[in-house]
């Protein structure tokens, strides 16, 4: 057994998973959790892996990417998924848990491991020696300041302002056209043209749609220079036509005329399977958001892989800062995990902790850190946060659009997703003993 100790800062989903993975590999862990000494605005207990929002870990089927990532984690002996399975409550095809039992179970498994020492204190500086930072979206101000100092002001963010992302295969290509404004450079945008009548229908639905209520600690985010599309719309219908939906320079090649308004879609991934809706950061609830977006010509049947969000979320610019091993590029023994890395969601956060934990243990044991291939769900997430365009980087949930493309194109969605899942699970089995 190595005498080196790994520091894990934060006992949320990612930190708890990381600590467990390190400990089970025979490495000592110091797990720092500032609760209950200092609470966050969202937490209510001193338990590890407290679920502060929904009690659902989302889909549990293999036709959904988050279901695949769960199955990969089961094969890799994830403490988070084991506890979730043991504390599950009826939820149809989803995995939902009794949140109190779940947090208690994770706390018990991690705290009682002989290689884990729990330190209930706030960390305000980045420790020397092997360390995983998994402090989550509500990282304390003092540590945030140190992380900002470490990563550089331009690479450290305090809130999400993400536009929705759709699957290219679900866009009606007969209704959209490829063009850049004024034909500058290569044709890089898919354009969804609107008549005045279509715009009016869209506008009325947008301003009437229900928004997510802001929590007290989130109320400052709209003053940071990034405004939700529905707030812009509330200032008058022309605000959008002269803003994110301006049609000038975007003549429709089919008619030769300039539409009344245009919604632009920009490629979001290297493979060209995902497109984001430009300028559509939003605080709409997901149900109404889908209804509004499907009023856009060409997006009537759009598959939304990430909904637009605006919320408090401390995260780093991982493409500039991290390797797909979750190591910090400038310091081999420093790892990041959880939502701070730009993975979005309970399961994705835990999965990043699993891989960061495995790699931290391997590092102190003198072994090479592991990069999971992007044909796996966990590997595709690590690849997304480290290889995507750094300039427009925003957090992302697991989705099949991030997976490496299949060798053979499969038209039917369910069959295609099953093929992604089968390939992922076949591949991950090669890594279960690392």
From Swiss-Prot:
It catalyses: uridine(54) in tRNA + (6R)-5,10-methylene-5,6,7,8-tetrahydrofolate + NADH + H(+) = 5-methyluridine(54) in tRNA + (6S)-5,6,7,8-tetrahydrofolate + NAD(+); uridine(54) in tRNA + (6R)-5,10-methylene-5,6,7,8-tetrahydrofolate + NADPH + H(+) = 5-methyluridine(54) in tRNA + (6S)-5,6,7,8-tetrahydrofolate + NADP(+). One of its GO terms (molecular function) is tRNA (uracil(54)-C5)-methyltransferase activity, 5,10-methylenetetrahydrofolate-dependent. Keywords: Cytoplasm, FAD, Flavoprotein, Methyltransferase, NAD, NADP, Transferase, tRNA processing. GO terms for cellular component: cytosol. Transmembrane segments: none annotated. The keyword Signal does not apply. It comes from the Bacteria. Its EC number is 2.1.1.74. Its main location: cytoplasm. GO terms for biological process: tRNA methylation; tRNA wobble uridine modification. InterPro entries: FAD/NAD-bd_sf (IPR036188), MnmG-rel (IPR002218), MnmG-rel_CS (IPR020595), MnmG_N (IPR040131), TrmFO (IPR004417). It is found in: Cytoplasm. Its cofactor is FAD. The keyword tRNA-binding does not apply. FAD binds at residues 10-15. Catalyzes the folate-dependent formation of 5-methyl-uridine at position 54 (M-5-U54) in all tRNAs. Belongs to the MnmG family. TrmFO subfamily. This is Methylenetetrahydrofolate--tRNA-(uracil-5-)-methyltransferase TrmFO. It comes from Bacillus cereus (strain ATCC 14579 / DSM 31 / CCUG 7414 / JCM 2152 / NBRC 15305 / NCIMB 9373 / NCTC 2599 / NRRL B-3711).
